Amino acid sequence: MPPARRVPRGSDRTSRSQSLRYTVDASVFVNAFNPHEDGHAASLAILTATQQGGDPVIVPTLLLPEIASAVTRASDDTAGALQYVSATAALSHLTLVSLTPVTARQAAELAAAHRLRGADAVYAAVARRYGTTLVSRDEEQRSRASAVVMCQTPEEALRSRQTPKRTRRSRTK
């Protein structure tokens, strides 16, 4: 697997990239994989929309083993799970962020301060560090992480992408 790509931080981001940058929890990727789960259509739709729009999705490398584990346990299909992991890792708009000692410490602080599960805190730390919206199917994660980052369900993320189009008024003298 290629090394994680570097993501620029700071004030040089454009307003478009600030409003359409996401950290997507494994719960959404797993839900999008299984057409029999409630919410599958919205999870698949937000992943498709970010890909088609080229919107940055910045996730911890932890995403990959989480997907492999959940898909294999639900389907007993190791090869299919690993194929999905490979396809996910290869997405051009997806950036994998390594769990460095600094990120791990930030996640630990979030876990302790907001009673987040360990993996949930890692996603929240990545979202906070890169100024992204955390998209998750996990109600507890969204509720607890919302103290530090913007959190949305896939349905909410889809709605927020739909901005009203402005029409030009003609000026008459």
Annotate each language-model stretch with its function:
Residues 2-21, 96-97, 124, 128-173:
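Acidic, PIN/NYN-like endoribonuclease modules and their adjacent C-terminal/linker elements
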Residues 2-59, 74-86, 159, 163, ...:
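Short, well-structured N-terminal submotif of metal-dependent ribonuclease cores
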Residues 24, 58-59, 98, 118, ...:
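Short beta-strand scaffold positions
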Residues 28, 63, 103, 122-123, ...:
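Alpha-helix capping/helix-boundary segments
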Residues 35, 61-62, 86-113:
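Acidic catalytic patch
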Residues 79, 95-97, 114-116, 139:
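Recognition helices and adjacent regulatory flanks at domain boundaries
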